[in-house]
Design a protein with these regions (language model features):
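Membrane-embedded alpha-helical bundles of multi-pass transporters
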Residues: 111-125, 154, 173, 412, ...
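Flexible metal-binding regulatory segments at protein termini and peripheral loops
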Residues: 1-128, 233, 249-252, 334-342, ...
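Conserved ATP-binding TGD loop and adjacent catalytic N/P-domain core of P-type ATPases
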Residues: 16, 29, 430-432, 512-514, ...
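Juxtamembrane coupling segments of multi-pass membrane pumps/enzymes
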Residues: 76, 182-185, 190-193, 207-268, ...
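ATP-driven catalytic headpiece of P-type ATPases
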Residues: 90, 309, 433-476, 506-587, ...
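Transmembrane helix-loop-helix hairpins at the membrane interface
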Residues: 87-241, 352, 717-722, 728, ...
Length: 843
């Protein structure tokens, strides 16, 4: 997707106009305009010039991003800086100064008798001329509203500035007419008419409208600037210089001058400038800036390092492998920025409304004036109602409702190592009903390790490990690697062997000194060595637990048994529990045999295990699961790319520095399964925030426009002064943006944000754990529409003495109830249905 910078947009109607204009360009397949970042993403074959011309023809400006060969992070950060708020603050200060003077003469003197210069006293024409002059000054200060508003109107695409310009202009125009009419009456000596026209002045309304809208614009601009804080903080991480080796000398150069293949050095305390490979030295590197992981990572020769991470202890000499826009940091920044420029499906309704909103409001204002005139009201009353309609209506609140929440939610994710590639992914993740987890590398560490050492009579554990290490030292098998790593960790050094053979039937043999060493699977060893029945029973039990038992012998006498297994990640059980507590069904996909798979599944606590699935078969399983609900597939993005692509949400876990995984729509930088429920939780919070924003934006306009038009005046006598309408409009967008900023306070790990319990050294199934688990029930509920519904159901359920807690989700339509003691399903059902929701099932 090609990115463009767009200038001149002031509200949602503007972005809708630009999007519509560019979408009509031949060759454009899709176009997405972001009012928040003043950017546009375009896909298709149309040239840059054709796209820019379309934007210019619509009345705005555009230029391709990165028109320069390469834009530094500092320049990108500068582009994101809030340049608008300082300008608005100056405009507001000047406007307020002249408005205070205007209000003194227009209201203070008339209502409270405040003193005025002698030349003005009882000189109504002079007072009117002064008010007109002060209003003109304020209009000139805020000329942007008129230039933008009427330019857009001439292009057939009226925007929010058009409403402000028409409202303030109508107030000023009618007041100017009244001033000239009053002057004529003064000349004729008709003092009654003079006093009547004095009350027809709306100069202060025109000035107040412009000033209050500027207040709102400044507050909105400041709040919008806050939404890009996460992106700007990422950009600040980028080093500005690097120390490279040129002609054998160390030279400090700009980061833009570093090229792939350059040798650079990093001393303790310095940030690593670009991605690279360590050529010399060792150190501990803090990668928290990229991964959020606070524990430093040891680096040595051959290790990879990433830009913006901090060298803490040693001297490193490295070779640059990825520079400029190819570094991990640049990819993350681009991913976050591109996601902010895309649109979520939920925004479509707001976009449709924004496209016709301003013309509809102008029409309503004209009809309002005509109706009140036909009803017998004077022109001043009718005009005030029409102006109120113009200035209270706010398309910006509609246009900002979705993008500000997407930007803040996406930034929160990036800070926590959760990268959403686009707004669609951020929305879809929250709708997940089923999570399919790949086993190897996702639930488990992906690296087999020794879990049990059971020596035969006459052998110690160390004797057995020494024998196994000597035999396995010449093997390349993954299980041999696990044995060797355990031996190294326990301080066992290998003794040289010769005549090593890998025998048919999963067996090994070698000669150590004069002793023949044998090792291998139970079936192989039973045929070659006499094995004690107790060891065979233990081997059977270990196999049932998903472990691989290996027998070892010396001179055909069994020395004992060592079990090896791919062990669970420490946080896997907790992550699965969190997903289930959120009302999500958890399934494990694996190519392992059913016995091993079920053992691992039981340890992790998943709802279902699908075993014997080859990598190419995972996609078919995901296709089947999608028939049952929205599916998120979690894998490493290597051998499960088709499954990740097929799922509604593909989540790649443990990406580390390789964040550009094409198959996944969500990338988890850390190899931490708890980030999966965190991503879903963040998505749900963002969706909830969008719903709140859209509700407020629609509710505000639906309530405000009829009130401004005077619909309730005949019944209750309610009418709205245009100045109060302008005040309401100025605050509406600010409220939407401020509500989105609340996401910055959201904890992605929620109540579960505590350290995961460390896994025991031997990974075993403890049958007693299933009996000790707290009882839970999942209720399927229809009728919940929002966060308020969730709170109502949660409060009702938790009022029951047997209920410890209730986790309610209106998106999933579930309530997961944790019970301290048994409670009848009928009681739970009645409790919820008394709140006017329907319970369809209880699991």
């Amino acid at each position: 997707m090609k990115q463009y910078e767009v200038t001149g947009m002031s509200c949602a109607a503007c972005s809708a106009r630009v999007e519509k204009a560019v979408s009509k360009v031949p060759g454009v397949t899709s176009c997405s305009v972001s009012l928040l970042t003043n950017s546009m993403g375009v896909e298709g074959t149309a040239s840059d010039q054709e796209i820019v011309n379309a934007v210019v023809a619509a009345g705005y400006g555009a230029a391709p991003k990165g028109a320069k060969k390469e834009q530094t992070a500092a320049e990108e950060e500068e582009a994101l800086k809030d340049h608008e708020t300082p300008k608005l603050r100056k405009r507001l200060t000047a406007s307020v100064i002249f408005l205070v003077v205007l209000m003194y003469f227009s209201m203070g003197h008339m209502m409270w008798g405040w003193p005025v210069p002698a030349a003005m006293k009882d000189n109504h024409v002079a007072m009117g001329m002064l008010q007109m002059l002060l209003t003109i000054i304020i209009m000139v200060i805020n000329q942007k509203f008129f230039v933008s508003g009427f330019t857009s109107l001439l292009h057939g695409a009226p925007n929010m500035d058009t409403l402000v310009a028409l409202g303030a202009g109508a107030s000023f125009g009618y007041s100017t007419y009244a001033l000239f009419a009053m002057t004529g009456a003064q000349v004729r000596g008709d003092m009654d008419a003079v006093m009547g026209y004095m009350h027809e002045f709306y100069f202060e309304s025109a000035a107040m409208i412009l000033t209050l809208i500027t207040v709102g614009k400044m507050l909105e601009s400041h709040a919008k600037g806050k939404t890009t804080d996460a992106l700007k903080s990422l950009m600040r991480l980028a080093p500005k210089t690097a120390t490279v080796v040129r002609d054998g000398k160390e030279v400090i150069v700009s980061i833009t001058e570093v090229r792939q293949g350059d040798t650079f050095v990093v001393r303790p305390g310095e940030n690593i400038p670009v991605d690279g490979i360590v050529l010399e030295g060792s150190s501990a590197v803090n990668e928290a800036a990229l991964t959020g992981e606070s524990i430093p990572v040891d680096k040595q020769k051959g290790s990879s390092v990433s830009a913006a991470t901090t060298n803490q202890s040693g001297f490193l000499r490295c070779e640059a492998t990825r520079v400029g826009e190819d570094t991990t940091l640049s990819q993350i920044i681009r991913m976050v920025s591109d996601a902010a420029a895309t649109k979520a499906p939920i925004a479509k309704i707001a976009d449709k409304v924004s496209g016709i909103f301003v013309p509809a409001v102008i029409t309503i204002a004209v009809i309002t004036i005509m109706v009140w005139l036909l009803a017998g009201k004077d022109i001043g009353f009718a005009l005030a109602r029409g102006i109120s309609v113009l200035v209270i209506s706010c398309p910006c609140a509609l246009g900002l409702a979705t993008p500000v929440a997407i930007m803040v939610g996406n930034g929160m994710g990036a800070k926590n190592g959760i990268l959403f590639k686009n707004a669609v992914a951020l929305e879809n993740a929250g709708k997940t009903q089923i999570v399919a987890l790949d086993k190897t590398g996702t639930i488990t560490t992906g690296e087999p390790r020794v879990t049990d050492i059971l020596p035969a009579e006459g052998y110690t554990k160390r004797d057995l490990m020494q024998l196994a290490a000597d035999l396995e030292s010449s093997s390349e098998h993954p299980l041999a690697k696990a044995v060797m790593e355990h031996a190294k960790a326990t301080g066992i050094s290998q003794t040289a062997v010769h005549d090593f053979q890998a025998l048919p039937g999963n067996g090994l043999s070698a000669v150590r000194g004069e002793d023949l060493l044998l090792g291998g699977s139970v079936s192989y060893m039973k045929e070659n060595v006499t094995v004690d029945s107790i060891l065979l029973d233990q081997a059977q039990k270990l196999a049932e637990e998903g472990k691989t038992p290996l027998l070892f012998a010396k001179n055909h006498i069994c020395a004992g048994l060592i079990a090896v297994a791919d062990t669970l990640k420490e946080d896997s059980p907790q992550a699965v529990d969190e997903l289930r507590d959120m009302g999500i069904r958890v399934i494990m996909l694996t190519g392992d045999n059913e016995r091993t798979a079920k053992a691992i599944g039981a340890q992790a606590g998943v709802d279902e295990v699908i075993a014997g699935v080859l990598p190419e078969g995972k996609e078919a399983e995901i296709r089947k699961l999608k028939e049952q609900g929205k599916v998120a597939m979690v894998g490493d993005g290597i051998n499960d790319a088709p499954a990740l692509t097929r799922a509604d949400t593909g989540i790649a876990i443990g990406a580390g520095t390789d964040v550009a995984i094409d198959a996944a729509s969500v990338v988890l930088v850390k190899s931490r399964l708890r980030d999966v429920p965190a991503a879903i939780r963040l998505s749900r919070a963002t969706l909830r925030n969008i719903h709140e924003n859209l509700f407020w934006a629609f509710f505000y306009n639906v309530i405000g426009i009829p009130l401004a038009a005077g619909v309730w005046y005949p019944v209750f006598g309610w009418k709205l002064n245009p100045m109060f309408g302008a005040a309401a409009m100025s605050l509406s967008s600010f409220c939407v943006v401020t509500n989105a900023l609340r996401l910055n306070l959201f904890s992605v790990h929620g109540k579960a944000n505590k350290d995961a319990a460390p896994a025991a050294e031997p990974v075993e199934i403890k049958t007693s754990e299933s009996e000790e688990k707290v009882m839970t029930k999942t209720m399927h509920i229809e009728g919940m529409m929002c966060g308020h519904c969730e709170a109502t159901v949660k409060k009702a359920l938790e009022a029951l003495p047997e209920v410890t807690s209730a986790e309610v989700s209106h998106e999933a339509g579930t309530a997961v109830v944790t019970l301290s003691s048994e409670v009848a399903d009928d009681v739970l059902k009645k409790t919820v249905e008394e709140k006017d929701y329907k319970v369809t099932a209880i699991d």
